[in-house]
Amino acid sequence: MNEREKLEQAIATAKEIHKRQKYSRIDFYDPYPFQKNFHDTGFENNQRLLMCANRIGKSYCGAAEMAMHLTGLYPDWWQGRKYRKAITAWVGGVSNESTRDICQAELLGPPEDPEAWGTGAIPKDCIVSSERKPGVPNAKSLGLIKHISGSNSTVHFKSYESGVEKWM
């Protein structure tokens, strides 16, 4: 292999690595100790609270765990609860807009950029489909996610401002 071929191969490899990091972000999740502790306690506790300072990874920590449960793809270090079958899950925020801008973005990718679909915690190749939320630009009401069991998990995006009747 000559120098040019080696360089072309190195460039192709770098592009593939970048693509995998972009569209399989969860594969590169390396939690901080407080995040790992949060995940681990899920084995014994149905309800947990992750209360920390701003901008240190709470949202992505929750999105990473939700992505693992929706897909059934767990890393080797995982000690928390595991779902071997597809699940139905609810993800909620204060408003439709905050649910879209935080929860949906962390799970699926930035809502305003169609090219970024699949750059969130859920790998692009696991996103089967989604349904648009009426009246909220770029927001989804649900996502269908491929689970390793062969079935599809469903994630519903909800907001607290919609009232309790929307949660029942």
Per-region residue spans from a language model:
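Phosphate/NTP-binding elements of NTP-utilizing enzymes
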Residues: 1-168
